[in-house]
Amino acid sequence: MEESQYKQEHNKKVAQDEGQEDKDTIFETIEAIEAKLMELKTNPESTFNYGIFPEVYMNQGEEILYPAWSLKEENLFQTFKSLRLFQKLCPRGSGNLVKKSWYPCVPEEGGHIINIQDLFGPNIGTQKEPQLVIIEGAAGIGKSTLARQVKRAWMEGELYRDHFQHVFFFSCRELAQCKKLSLAELITQGQDVPTAPINQILSHPEKLLFILDGIDEPAWVLADQNPELCLYWSQTQPVHTLLGSLLGKSILPEASFLLTTRTTALQKFIPSLPQSCQVEVLGFSDFEQEIYIYKYFAKQIFGIKALMMVESNPVLLTLCEVPWVCWLVCNCLKKQMEQGGDVSLTSQTTTAICLKYISLTIPVHHMRTQLRALCSLAAEGIWKRRTLFSESDLCKQGLDEDAVAIFLKTGVLQKQASSLSYSFAHLCLQEFFASMSCILEDSEERHGDMEMDRIVETLVERYGRQNLFEAPTVRFLFGLLSKEGLKEMEKLFSCSLPGKTKLKLLWHILGKSQPHQPPCLGLLHCLYENQDMKLLTHVMHDLQGTIVPDTDDITHTVLQTNVKHLVVRTDMELMVVTFCIQFCSHMRSLQLNMEGQQGYALTAPRMVLYRWTPITNASWKILFYNLKFNSNLEGLDLSGNPLSYSAVQYLCDAMIYPGCQLKTLWLVECGLTPTYCSLLASVLSACSSLRELDLQLNDLCDDGVRMLCEGLRNRACNLRILRLDLYSLSAQVITELRTLEENNLKLHISSIWMPQMMVPTENMDEEDILTSFKQQRQQSGANPMEILGTEEDFWGPIGPVATEVVYRERNLYRVQLPMAGSYHCPSTRLHFVVTRAVTIEIEFCAWSQFLDKTPLQQSHMVVGPLFDIKAEQGAVTAVYLPHFVSLKDTKASTFDFKVAHFQEHGMVLETPDRVKPGYTVLKNPSFSPMGVVLRIIPAARHFIPITSITLIYYRVNQEEVTLHLYLVPNDCTIQKAIDDEEMKFQFVRINKPPPVDNLFIGSRYIVSGSENLEITPKELELCYRSSKEFQLFSEIYVGNMGSEIKLQIKNKKHMKLIWEALLKPGDLRPALPRIAQALKDAPSLLHFMDQHREQLVARVTSVDPLLDKLHGLVLNEESYEAVRAENTNQDKMRKLFNLSRSWSRACKDLFYQALKETHPHLVMDLLEKSGGVSLGS
């Protein structure tokens, strides 16, 4: 069975398998939508002020997605403000830096996501406000709607009101109908209602904004030919000359412009185009897409049904990222619901959706001739760059009045209110009909190759060779010439369209593309629309040769390489690329790097995808959906990308699918927690192809690794290499791992954690240093068990660096970083990048000490711990400050994050250089009490998703167990304050995994558990309280804990389970005796090994068994042999103690455990003599 057919049949099963999960997600989404709509009624300015949530209007006077449609034909009228906007970094004289081709070297960073209110904001580099903003984007992505929204928002006082006094909107397709205009007439035409005399308007040109929508649509060249003729605002000029003079700054040079266009190659249309700010529209945000689908339908039940259907189909969900396609999908579903039959949509391409739309909308059986005429009209307009047609144009093509009336009623055509002209509902729709015309014109055999040549030459003349595959008309042609496309067209037009003949047309188009052109996203889009296996295999095979650089990019040299680099900014691009590489037999590995990080090098021939925009659950869903069918792919590297629980679920589902043959999986630094390990363990048991799994730099803890061990014990597991952070595991778990290795000689468990020394140079920023450090660490071949540390240590180029306690009561600590490099502390989540050896002091502070003196709480929300850091000036080139906002789920912009500095003269808010999941990055920082805050509106405080932790403490009193359960934001200063408070009353913490889902401040949760538990109170509120304040908790009385108990936390509103833990009697270790106050004030506490050094040297009689237990854990081969070489037991112990000077506390804990196993009576005797206090494990 062909793979494309196989995938189509599989779609139904996907919908069933994911149905229940999607239902849960849908109802959560609906509640969020309804809550947002309620908020908008009370605070309509919220979106523009802060850009966190989309806005939906449902009033009759508002415009729909494509405002020229008759309002009477629709029951929903929306505008949307949460289109994703990507500002490109394009220096003067450069081309488009965000490449759309494969290259043999790493692409430069292309830009960042911005909000609509930032369009005319200061440039990050120059801090100058742009006068020209170019809005570009794919067909149907929402450029025109965005332009109209800017005008409307300005009129309503929500946007740029202080920036501009007058805003003029022009549709270039309509403007091109005017032959001549004066500047005064142009301004009058751009206003809904005249607001002031022309001389008053022109008196402040710096306060004028001209919006030109669709600047590339008309066939004109806007050259500034005769600037001296445009000095008089009352003198008429050809429209293209007038616009060219405006854009060329010959007249009104201080005025600002906003242009929308499909292409960035505007120099051929506007030769005198000045330096601009380029912003690309990437389509719907996830939340906006859900709102649009849900609110499209008048009845809520239909909206829910449509949303569930789209969410259950990863391909359809991705296609709906484009607003125009989303409208087509909703329209098709609405027609099916109205007709009362089965409601289903299995279309995999935009072309297939368009064909479905026509079959449901137009009564084709009675209108085949008229439909052909409509296609001819569309084609003529495309070739001549016309989108408006007169009645005579329609008659010339043979369209009668009845047919025009039907096309108007169905919404395919629309009549312009301001004139007697007609247009297609959307330019994309006109291009689709034009593509059908090409095929119909070529359907008569008498034309043969000559007709094909004529069609292809027309396409090349219209779009150019270099941009041929970017044109929607060409992409639709590829889709229509597919097997399914031709079959549907034959039904529509009741004619025969021989497949072999049509295939020739495709090869004609491919042959006319620019020779030696690099493989580009446009070509991949065309191949995706066609989905023919033979064509895909042939073309993708040809693309594996030499990659030639863009002629405008002198930094990319011609290289033969086995690595292909490509930037993907949207889920649509991600879907297209991952679909096409299935047919690249030589492409064995795939690597996805977020925000340009280098990742961890896989050696097989691979493709590296770069993503400068946030990766959402929808992104992971389509990526792993395509992964199911890629039998060629053997390696997948997702290192450095934070993965949600849902994302790991999608990954694991893909890996156990029969078509997936993945052998190597790298998930280094992906934010994995113990909860994820049950999913990974199931993969180890079910995925027989997996040979290598790297899970380093994740907080898996003992519980997570134990789950992995269950999967490793399964006979179906064929894993050969497992990499883990062994330094953070207990001796018992490490022993369990060693036992697994002994029982399975093919399995190797390690932790590559010893990089070579790396000294940063002046040319490396903090990202380069961090990347280099990671790569060196990964490439090292050192024994992983030679170095162990704790979560309180700072991990750097040479391993762990101990943190010293300076003043315990003040929570003041000191760390002496020994050399240049990047250092990370797992417990505080602080990162430092330093250029030389430096001593850093860190004090935990309470926000309440500083916030009460400022109005910050009204406009900002605390989203991270507050530290007072002191370091030598210039030694620290970057600091990573932790925050607990979930970037993958929040609607907040990264520009809303600020670092609050509390200095002697007051508070300063600094914009971080970068915002990453869990961190904000400051380059060349100055230090003072500092922490991360988020700019919000008060009503949005409860809509910010955060990461949280659960803390469980227990105390055993006369065999009765009492538990304290906390639910707090992931803030180390709060955790430390709770630890200290609980320790006063001899409560001991039990480590359990945190909640998987993101939670919301102010939400309430119900605590429950096994029978016979007394819980007070049963309700907990998740709130942020300063570390100096009392934290909320539930007290749980267990009684005599003879068996395991289960604890659960559920959302009070939905009763959805958000966390559960199983407590076993073995989790309760005897509490340590209270330590004297004098000891508490000491800088550090003596370990059992150091307390009893003299006794241990004298009384350990069997040293070799002790050494055997330490071999591979604490002692490497050289150290092991050096100790054994000593003559007497006393000398061996002295040698061992000499080596222990460099050991961390974790290493000493392992020594203590080994000593208890080999000399239990000696350990008990020493404990009794010291009063029973042991500071070993």
Swiss-Prot record:
Q: How is its activity regulated?
A: Activated by pathogens and other damage-associated signals: activation promotes ubiquitination and degradation of the N-terminal part, releasing the cleaved C-terminal part of the protein (NACHT, LRR and PYD domains-containing protein 1b, C-terminus), which polymerizes and forms the Nlrp1b inflammasome. Nlrp1b inflammasome is inhibited by DPP8 and DPP9, which sequester the C-terminal fragment of Nlrp1b (NACHT, LRR and PYD domains-containing protein 1b, C-terminus) in a ternary complex, thereby preventing Nlrp1b oligomerization and activation.
Tell me the disulfide pairings in this chain.
none
State the residue spans of region: Disordered: 1-20
This entry's Gene Ontology molecular function terms read: ATP binding; cysteine-type endopeptidase activator activity; peptidase activity
Site feature location: Trigger for autolytic processing: H901
Q: Where does ATP bind?
A: G137, A138, A139, G140, I141, G142, K143, S144
Q: Where is this region: ZU5?
A: 794-927
NACHT domain: from which residue to which, for each copy?
A: 131-440
What the record says about the induction of its expression is: Up-regulated transiently following acute injury of the sciatic nerve with a peak after 44 hours.
Pfam families recorded for this chain? CARD, FIIND, LRR_6, NACHT, NLRC4_HD2, NOD2_WH, UPA-FIIND
The entry's localization annotation reads: Cytoplasm, Cytosol
Q: Which InterPro entries match?
A: CARD (IPR001315), CARD8/ASC/NALP1_CARD (IPR033516), DEATH-like_dom_sf (IPR011029), FIIND_dom (IPR025307), Leu-rich_rpt (IPR001611), LRR_dom_sf (IPR032675), NACHT_NTPase (IPR007111), NLRP_HD2 (IPR041267)
Show the SUPFAM superfamilies listed in the entry.
DEATH domain, P-loop containing nucleoside triphosphate hydrolases, RNI-like
Where are the stretches annotated UPA? 928-1077
User: Any extra detail in the entry?
Assistant: Three tandem Nrlp1 paralogs, Nrlp1a, Nrlp1b and Nrlp1c, have been identified. Nlrp1c is predicted to be a pseudogene.
Please describe what this protein does.
Acts as the sensor component of the Nlrp1b inflammasome, which mediates inflammasome activation in response to various pathogen-associated signals, leading to subsequent pyroptosis. Inflammasomes are supramolecular complexes that assemble in the cytosol in response to pathogens and other damage-associated signals and play critical roles in innate immunity and inflammation.
Recorded protein name is NACHT, LRR and PYD domains-containing protein 1b allele 2
> Whose protein is this, by species?
Mus musculus (Mouse)
GN (gene name): Nlrp1b
